[in-house]
Amino acid sequence: MGVSLLASSSAFVTKPLLTQLVHLSPISLNFTVRRFKPFTCLSRYYTTNPYNMTSNFKTFNLDFLKPDLDERSYRFIELPNKLKALLIQDPKADKAAASLDVNIGAFEDPKNLPGLAHFCEHLLFMGSEKFPDENEYSSYLSKHGGSSNAYTASQNTNYFFEVNHQHLFGALDRFSGFFSCPLFNKDSTDKEINAVNSENKKNLQNDIWRIYQLDKSLTNTKHPYHKFSTGNIETLGTLPKENGLNVRDELLKFHKNFYSANLMKLCILGREDLDTLSDWTYDLFKDVANNGREVPLYAEPIMQPEHLQKIIQVRPVKDLKKLEISFTVPDMEEHWESKPPRILSHLIGHEGSGSLLAHLKKLGWANELSAGGHTVSKGNAFFAVDIDLTDNGLTHYRDVIVLIFQYIEMLKNSLPQKWIFNELQDISNATFKFKQAGSPSSTVSSLAKCLEKDYIPVSRILAMGLLTKYEPDLLTQYTDALVPENSRVTLISRSLETDSAEKWYGTAYKVVDYPADLIKNMKSPGLNPALTLPRPNEFVSTNFKVDKIDGIKPLDEPVLLLSDDVSKLWYKKDDRFWQPRGYIYLSFKLPHTHASIINSMLSTLYTQLANDALKDVQYDAACADLRISFNKTNQGLAITASGFNEKLIILLTRFLQGVNSFEPKKDRFEILKDKTIRHLKNLLYEVPYSQMSNYYNAIINERSWSTAEKLQVFEKLTFEQLINFIPTIYEGVYFETLIHGNIKHEEALEVDSLIKSLIPNNIHNLQVSNNRLRSYLLPKGKTFRYETALKDSQNVNSCIQHVTQLDVYSEDLSALSGLFAQLIHEPCFDTLRTKEQLGYVVFSSSLNNHGTANIRILIQSEHTTPYLEWRINNFYETFGQVLRDMPEEDFEKHKEALCNSLLQKFKNMAEESARYTAAIYLGDYNFTHRQKKAKLVANITKQQMIDFYENYIMSENASKLILHLKSQVENKELNENELDTAKYPTGQLIEDVGAFKSTLFVAPVRQPMKDFEISAPPKLNNSSESE
C-alpha cells in the first residue's frame, strides 16, 4: 500500500517530474530501417453490432489486437451500475489476479484533510460488512499462495491481488467488499493513521520524495498538484480533532462520494471461461453504488509565468549532483498512436555517438542522462531532461543548460524525419508481436488503469505501445515548445546556497531567476557540430523465424554440451515459448578478483570502465531490444546477454572483443571512481531496511565487506593500481556458459570457442570451479548482536533484522523453513504491523545463504531496536500456540499454497533462463529444485512443523544473529515502559567483525545434485505429450 509518485496516467513516464525523469526503455523507443508488413487488424475495433445485452450486463463485441503468442481470451463488459470490466481467460494460469482502478486520487483530497484518499486506500483492507475481520482478506490470500497491494496516485487509486488460481472466487468475494460495503471501523481507523504516518516518515529523508514535493509546492496553488498527498498524523489526526472533524465520518463521505461504480474499471484474470468470469463479476460487483459522478477535470495551469524561468537550488540528503530542466508542453496524451513525447525522448535521451550525453561525457561533465514526457492532468503536460553531473559538470552547469538547447536547436533544424519514425515503429511492432507474459498482478493492475483512458478503443488496450500514425506536424509542435520561456531548472547539490525550507519534508532550497546572459544563450544557442541525430541501428533484427514443433513436452533442464579443464557449456533449445529470443549467461570464475577487498574494488572499477567504454554498443543494442551487461560477482565476473536471437551472438562477439581490447583511460577512471565513491556514501543514507542486507552479508559471508569498508578502500585506489591489476584478472580462469533460446547448438559451441580464443593464457586451476562463496556457521545455542548508528543523523527510523540460523543447508531443511515462513507470514504482519503498529515495514521470510538455512524477521520502526527485539521474541513465543491450535484443514491449505507457488509454470523465457542461471551459479545444478521441494513440503505433517518450531526456533540450542541499525533521533513520545532493559537487547556484542568471523567455521558449498554426462542436445519431436 502506498502513495504513488505517478502524477499522471501517462504510459510514457514512471516517475514524477523533476525526480526520476524517464527516458523510456529503448525496447519500446527505437527504430529499424526495414519494414514489417502492417498488422491487418489494427483498424478493427468493433464488429457491426457494438454490444450484446444479456439480462444482467452489457457485453461488447470486440476484436482485440493481441501479441502473436497470446493464447488468452478477452471480454469487455459493463454492469448495470456502469462499472466496466475486462475479463481474461488464461487456461494455463497458475496464479489468478484481479485489479480495480478508481478514477479518483489524491487530487480530490479535501483542503483540510491532506492524505485522505491515501488513508481511504489503507482502510479498505481492514474489513467489510460481509467479511468484518480486519485481516480476513490478507489471511485468505496468504493461505492460498496470494498477495496484494494498492497505491494512490494523483487521479486514480489502484487495488490488486493475485492468488492460486483455484481460489479466485473467494478472493474476489472478499475484494469486492472494499467497494460495496467497507466498514471503516473506528479501531482500525485510529490504528491505521499510525501506518500512514509511518509510511510518510519512511520517506522523509528520501531525496526523490523530498524533491518531488518541493516541485509540487512551487506551483500554482489553485491546481491540486500543489498539495501534500501522503498524509501524516498531523493532517489526519491532530488537526482534524482540533477543528472538530471526525475523520471516520470524512472517510465514509469520501468513499460514498468518489468511489462510484461509473468511475471504476475492473480487470480479472483466471482459468475460468469468460461466461463464468462475467457471472462472477456481476454477482460480486453489481452492488457497488453508482452516483453518476463525472471524472473531475483540473483546468488551472500548474505552471504560471511566475513559476517559469527560475533555477531552484536544492540541498539534498545524499551527495547528489543533478540538473533537471522541465518544459511546459502541449498535452499529447490523446495522440497515443503517434506518441511525439516518445520520439523526442528517444532522441534527447540517446546515449550513442553524436548524442547529448556522449558529448557531455567527453567533456567530463555528466555520467547519465534521461528524458521523458509527462502529463499530470488534462492540458498540463511537461517534458524534462535529467542529468547526473560530475563535479566539473556542476561547475559548468550553465554550459550544460546551453548544450541542452543546442541539441534542441539541432532537432528543430533536422526534424521531422520519416526514417526515425519508421524504425521506432518497427521496433514497437516487433516488441508487441513477441511480447512475453508478465506477472498476473502487474498485468491486471496496468490494464485496469489503462482502461481509464477512454480515448483509446478497448480493443487496442493490449497494444497501446504501438506506433501506428505518422504525424510530423505534432512532433514539430511539441519540439517547438522547448523554449526558455516554458522552462525551469532544478539544480541539486549539497554545496548550493539555500534560504528556505519546504513545509512537509523540510527540504532546503532557494529560487533564483535565470541570469540575463544565460537567457540570451538559451534563446540563441547556435548549432554544435558534435551534436547529431543517432545513426541507423545495426542491431535491429529482421528475421524472427522460429521452427515451432507442436505437441512436445518441454525439457526440465539444460544439457551439458561440453566440459573440460577450462569450461562447462550448458545448452537448452527453447521448447516451451517458441519465441525468437535468446539468453546467454557467461560466468567467469576468477579467484584473483575477490582475493582481497582491494582486488574486489579494482574488479568493480574494471567492469564499470569497460561498460563505459562499450556504452555505444550496449545502447544501440538496447534500442533494438537486446541487452548485454558486464558485472562483478562474488565468484569473478559475469556477462549476460538477451533479446531477439538473430543478432544476439553478433552482439556478444562484438562485446567480448571490446572487453578483450579495452584499455582504461585515466580521465574516465577519475570520473567513475568519484561516481562510485558518491554511490557508496549515498548507500549509507538509504532508508534503514535497504541497508540491512549489506551489513548482514558482511558479517555472515566470506570475502564480503561493509559499505564503509569498501568506501575506505575505494577512496585510495589509483589508476596505476588498476593498470597493474588488469593483466592478473584472468589468471587461472574457469568459465561456465548457459545458452538458452532460439539458438542452434552449433552456435553455442562457437561461443565457447570464441571465449577460449580470447583467454590470455592457459594456466589451468581446477580448484577455481569450486571457489564459491560460503557462509559462516554460528555456534549452537549462541546469540550474537551487531549494533551501529545510522549515518543519516536526521532519520527517525531504526531497523532490526532478527535471523535464526537453522543449520547447514539441505533440501529437507529448506522445505521445513519454507513452510514455516509461509505459516508465519500473515500472522507476523498482522501482529507486528497491523495490531501493534510497530512500523510500516514488517517482513518475514526464509533465507537460504551460501550453505546455511535461516528464518528472519525484519522491522523498520521509530521504536528502539531492543523494544523491537522484544516484540519479535514475543511473537515467536505466542506463535507456538497458534501453530498447535491450527486446524488440520488450515495447515493443509498452507502446504497447498506453498506447493502451488513452487510448481508455478514459467511465465516467460526470461524466468526459465533465470532459474537455470541460478542453479549454475550456486553450483548444485539443481535445475528442478522447486519441484523437489514441493514434494518434500507435501509430505510434512503438522507434528513435524511443531517439532521444527520447538527444535529450531525456540530451542536453547538455537543460533541467532540480530542486527540493530539505530536511529540517532530520540523519540520521547513512544511508550516503551514495559521493556525489560535488563534482558534486551540480547546476545554477545560483535565489536570487531573481522575478529568475530575468524572464530567461526564455514558451511560447505552446495554440491551437484547428480552427475551430468556430456551429451548432444536431444532432437525435438512431437512424439511426447505437451505440457
From Swiss-Prot:
EC number(s) per UniProt?
Answer: 3.4.24.-
Co-factor remark: Binds 1 zinc ion per subunit.
The active site consists of 121 (proton acceptor)
Report the record's Gene Ontology biological process terms.
mitochondrial protein processing; peptide catabolic process; peptide mating pheromone maturation involved in positive regulation of conjugation with cellular fusion; proteolysis involved in protein catabolic process; response to pheromone
Please name the GO terms that the record assigns under molecular function.
metal ion binding; metalloendopeptidase activity
What does its activity-regulation comment describe?
Inhibited by chelating agents like EDTA, TPEN and 1,1-phenanthroline, as well as NEM, free cysteine and DTT.
Question: Top enzyme class of this protein?
Answer: hydrolase
Keywords in alphabetical order: Hydrolase, Membrane, Metal-binding, Metalloprotease, Pheromone response, Protease, Zinc
GO CC annotation: what is one?
Answer: cytosol
Superkingdom field:
Eukaryota
Principal location class = membrane
The subcellular localization recorded is: Membrane
Thermal effects on activity, per the entry? Answer: Optimum temperature is 37 degrees Celsius.
Q: Provide the protein name.
A: A-factor-processing enzyme
Give the gene symbol.
STE23
